[in-house]
Amino acid sequence: MLQPKRTKYRKVQKGRMKGNSQRGHELSNGMFGIKSVHEDGMFLTSRQIEAARIAATRYMKREGQLWIKIFPDKPITKKPLEVRMGKGKGAVEYWAAVVKPGRIMFEVGGVPLSVAKEALRLAAQKLPVKTKFVVARDFEA
């Protein structure tokens, strides 16, 4: 599972996810990718990212390369069940990545278009966000 090795602070505030992604909205490594087109931002947990990675790499059968372009660096806390409010913030439950609309989440290279499309479709099924398959501008079929 992905998570930071060390952080400056153990817990962070929830924050708001307004607007579209300011960075990471163009392909940088591979020829194909999946982009978030959800109406508003979402948290993707490290488990969801890992499930999508496994689904894509299994279909590609170790051919080509897969890049994960998001990293779960936000700790999400939760208080235990049946505990009254107050008494401080809960313990860190899991790590999540903030994904805004327009963000490229996974990139694939070194495989044909049909293989990349199916691998990323299988990966997208594991994610709770609406996605769109994108192709690099300099790609020639």
From Swiss-Prot:
Gene3D superfamilies in the record: Ribosomal protein L10e/L16 (3.90.1170.10)
Gene Ontology BP terms: translation
Keyword Signal belongs to the record: no
Region (Disordered): 1-29
Molecular function (Gene Ontology), one example: structural constituent of ribosome
Composition bias, Basic residues: 1-17
SUPFAM superfamilies: Ribosomal protein L16p/L10e (SSF54686)
Keywords: Ribonucleoprotein, Ribosomal protein, RNA-binding, rRNA-binding, tRNA-binding
Domain of life: Bacteria
Residues of the signal peptide: none
Pfam families the UniProt entry points to: Ribosomal_L16
GO cellular component: cytosolic large ribosomal subunit
NCBIfam families for the chain: rplP_bact
Quaternary structure annotation from Swiss-Prot or TrEMBL: Part of the 50S ribosomal subunit.
Family: Belongs to the universal ribosomal protein uL16 family.
Role this protein plays: Binds 23S rRNA and is also seen to make contacts with the A and possibly P site tRNAs.
Name by which UniProt lists this protein: Large ribosomal subunit protein uL16
Species in which this protein is naturally found: Flavobacterium johnsoniae (strain ATCC 17061 / DSM 2064 / JCM 8514 / BCRC 14874 / CCUG 350202 / NBRC 14942 / NCIMB 11054 / UW101)
Originating gene: rplP
